[in-house]
């Protein structure tokens, strides 16, 4: 297509394929992703030996994928309640855990900890993983109320976490010591109901 011809060679698109429950990295210059060479890398929770078989259901209906760590890893969330940090080179999750259903978004904080947004639980969740996490069940986490939480993003310039809920965008200050904690410092009201 004409639009694909304008995309610079080497450009990549990272996407979640819900039907096949896969994360894909595709060549953005190829308009037909069924063509050979279009899919450059893929990950599936069902084939990742780092994810226990009984936990794979947490990754039903992948909802968001973000390249992180200078595009050496992918941060994955799923409506089934799972979050995973997948090492691209190893094609394995270096961390994964469960929070609650309808997890929509995640972001990596500057120290390597992870925040997720879940609408079923009406909250964002701070996972303390920087010092290791021996198992998904033992993941240290803190919950912060945010009605119908749908999105989280780290603002490097302002050093704030922005989180979108049903009727507000909330700003959280992040403190790493003595232990990781979020503090709500601002809120921007939204008119109507926010959704994705």
Regions found by a protein language model. Name each.
Residues 10-12, 70-72, 111-113, 157-159:
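Short coil/turn segments that connect the beta-strands within blades of beta-propeller domains
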Residues 2-6, 52-66, 100-109, 146-153, ...:
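Repeated scaffold domains used in trafficking and secretory/extracellular systems
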